[in-house]
Amino acid sequence: SKTVGVPEVALAISAGDHDFGENRPECLEEKAAAFPQENWHFIGNVQSRAIPHIVQHACLIHSVYQEHHIQAIEKAAAKLDKVQDVLIEVNVSGEESKGGCAPADALALVKVALSCPHVRPRGLMTMAPQGDKHIAFETFTGLASLFRQIRQEIGENDSDTFTELSMGMSEDWREAVAAGATMIRVGRAIFSDSFTE
């Protein structure tokens, strides 16, 4: 829903959609205030100064990959007496233009999040390079493999809630689902009149 306004969100809700993603804190705040009963996901770049606003409205933050952001989320969530669900963003493809930690750093960040009483790591997120569905599938299978490794490392109690793989967008969601995605981000396919696969 990051490219549309409140009226379009209302139409989507009437059609049965209840999960929406925003990449700007001010848009998250506006739309979550209009529809507080819906599930609001933050999918944008996390900035320290915006974390209190994001935590106030997001059910899940998809784009966490720095330890100091985890600590800031812990502080903001504690003030709200809330446990904030997060995904660790991993840059599987190694593209410099993409956010996310290196795959080798993901487990350490999950453990940092597990050590915070008001942060709950729910899984991993990645974005694939655009334009090549074969490379996209390789990216997604790489994240799925890392996800399984981390679940084994963190043990049974914590792996019960570490269940989500957020990957795949409007142009490559089929490859993501084939690789094991539990969440896909398909706003353009839903909201854009000009989108074609």
Residue ranges, per PLM feature:
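Conserved alpha/beta-domain cores
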Residues: 1-171, 179, 191
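Divalent-metal-activated hydrolytic enzyme cores
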Residues: 182-184, 189
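Short, charged, intrinsically disordered terminal tails
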Residues: 193-196
